[in-house]
């Protein structure tokens, strides 16, 4: 018989009703003081770690006993998690802190099947829990020698302002290309296997200089807040079979890395470009979000690129630090990542079992951590059509923070498979007790694994997503689909309206639609002649800092000119020009400028010359 030692850290539970108090979460008008009692079951003689893998707290809410069960979120960080900040002279400082024994938990309330919890146990209990359909927040009261905490409903937090808070995304990623509901599609076994596979988003959070100064240069305070927010984000995506793992936190402690502006669209483009040219070269990741103190124009508090997960330029979001309540920030960040994963804004008919769902266009004063049925359908549809590969990349066994454990459904060092506990495992290819393949099995999971055997060579495992993609085939030697292949640069696309360039099909029309909306069109040639003038914003390229006007044959490779086609208004030659980032609004490299020609370094050149190299083709 195993002897256990019950360790009780606080024996008393004294409820107390308060009228008003100021906490980190804001001004609270009605709260209850509780003294949580922690009960930990340990084998006799066992050493108690600083933060146990599982904990249990008891306290009362509205006079009724509550038992809070917590489990450490072992998937919050990757082993190679890093933190980057900058010295006053701009020197990059990157550290790799030990994060295994962290203090961030998910949980539930005993005897409440609909309950959830996201809690930081670093210094008392801080976070939120859902009890009997109501969202409660809990904050430690900073009293000397006291275990007192305040518990209060979210609705009792004094609202910071009454202005609406909205997402800046306006375009449905399939506005012009409707398809059937994902549930109605006839899926191939490979598509179904892809849908069923666990997904992992390797996530980077970047804080601008304003965030650093807002928290009075206190790096520890900033980190704690971000960890609490991402812990909640992680919990929100679990029902979608996604793990959000924080792999890097970057803090611009010296200065902003580009000029910040209140125009969300411009800041989004600037952050996108900085990530592609700087951050990705230093830290491989799937998705990044910028948190800023900038008050975006209008009601906008966030913006992201639709259906862009894994895209080296577009898998980003920008977030305004609009609330002191971590739950509100987590919902906003999850909302923008939802856009990256193909989710549109909810319509009136969308439901999630709460008053508002994550993908509502306006942030509700009663936020929910649930994605609607529409969001889940959008996500499935996006996965089926786009199949973003990076989110299939499970963290390497050596990258997982916790020690290898057979039965946790994570493939770790020394394991051939891991289908969960023997009770829950339903995979006939995997021995749940040993995490080894069953006799005769070649594989247990993967899009090229069928009934425990490698799929026949030549079987399609990844459909072509568009004209510049190529279908990928199983090799017959692996359960995984080979590396994604793409059409060579210069391959015709979009009905010969463009040429493939670095996996995309850039056209003048699509660039006009991006900047000016779905009614926009390419302007007349007479507008583009403005690029022949030598002024501040019309030119073809820069040489040694000098702006070079376009030659007559190159005018469609300089500044982009569009017609907005606004109802009741005369079309004028419209351009986008931002002094803080002059590249915004220029025609993209690889864009078709004439039949058989593309833009290359501000010149309109023959497509075969632009992409020719010793191997036949190269990038511009």
Swiss-Prot record:
Residue ranges of the propeptide: 21-189
List of residues binding Ca(2+) 1: 202, 286, 390, 393
InterPro entries assigned: ADAM_Cys-rich, Disintegrin_CS, Disintegrin_dom, Disintegrin_dom_sf, MetalloPept_cat_dom_sf, Peptidase_M12B, Peptidase_M12B_N, Reprolysin_adamalysin
Record comment: activity regulation: Inhibited by EDTA and O-phenanthroline. Not inhibited by PMSF, benzamidine, irreversible serine-proteinase inhibitors and cysteine proteinase inhibitor E-64.
The EC number(s) this enzyme carries: 3.4.24.-
Primary subcellular site in the record, as a coarse category: secreted
Compartments, record wording: Secreted
Binding site for Zn(2+): 335, 339, 345
D/ECD-tripeptide, short sequence motif: residues: 467-469
GO molecular function: metal ion binding; metalloendopeptidase activity; peptidase activator activity; toxin activity
Protein name, UniProt field: Zinc metalloproteinase-disintegrin-like ACLD
Organism of this sequence: Agkistrodon contortrix laticinctus
